[in-house]
């Protein structure tokens, strides 16, 4: 299960883990639905969606727009995940609504109920690294601490724009570790990730068409994440097998932290 406040990049992280655009990323597109995203064992080129009606070959338009006739809180999507390693087990990511939506206070109720009542192997709590330690985060973290008893991984996204010499990924991790301890989390596991870099890298690796802006951002991220501090895999203490290619896409995937994160998730 993945939870976060809005603007943390939760949908982008899910798109990066799946390696396809299956979730909306605009804040104003959020709906009060729980998305169950299932890994298929084979790549057959189809994405299915069950949202009141079953679509065996859901188009991007169908995936990006919820069916108004669905009077439940659940939407199910199935596709083959594009991962660095072969996934030989059943995997389902449960995507919950952002809890601090100003448009719909019901989002918090749905997410809180999910955290309390849905059984899962792991909870991922995602922070917005550009706006960390907010009152909204503290409120939601307190709820998670009091109502979820399972394993938690904390991720800090959006630290790519930190200024060298002014901001520090390492310092942010250390500070948030201490803050989580103060809230009652014992020995919290906390890691950085660049969800957007990982998403763009996977799309490029699988020859998906990028917009002109995305192509420019991909090039910029390849350069930026080569810097030692922004090579996020070092913070996971995982050994990543190298798969070099000429355009540096594989290295960007490693530097983004997504490969080390996938190792953590799929070892459970």
Residue ranges and their predicted role:
Residues 1-267:
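Globular "head" domains of long coiled-coil molecular machines
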